[in-house]
Amino acid sequence: ENVKKTKEVVLYVKSINPDILVEGEIGYIGSASEVREELPEGVAIKPEDLTTPEEAKQFVYETGVDMLAPAVGNLHGMFANMPDPNLDIDRIRAIKEAVKLPLVLHGGSGNTDRDFRMAIQAGVVVVHINTEIRLAWRKGLEAGLSSNPNEVAPYKILPLAFEGVKGVVLKRLKLFNKLDTPLA
């Protein structure tokens, strides 16, 4: 089903503009951008559930995607009180070698800085951190509302939400672009 739908999207997009890049996701990464206390029941991130280089290569061949988002220990959403499970960096390297395409990390929120940097060095070129950004926005909005509970003007409430998002984005941009710094 995933292959069929992804191939349809690729064909449609390329018929409109062949220069538009299409990204495809393979493997179980979850489906919700939310903050969790623990892994949902029945969900376990086991090595045998992650995308293999062979599966990735076949998916790319059958769909024609320009970028690939494989399951490599990542999960949509993030945990409240602990980092997400570790990314399989060796698997990222092997998939990159097999598909020879840019790799995308879906479900990046909650991963450690070390995992991000190692994943980028192994071949990831795009990192999705949507839950982390949404959480910063929500916390900023809540702070804006609680600091003046009678305020109703959005332009007076929203600046803390925007600052929260800006802080996360700047922090991640700095991290993602400091690849020459040795890993500790």
Task: List PLM regions with ranges.
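Thr-Gly-centered strand-to-loop micro-motif
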Residues: 105-107
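Extended, intrinsically disordered, low-complexity segments
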Residues: 144-184
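Active-site-adjacent substrate-binding region
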Residues: 102
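Alpha/beta enzyme core
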Residues: 1-99, 113-129, 135, 139-143, ...
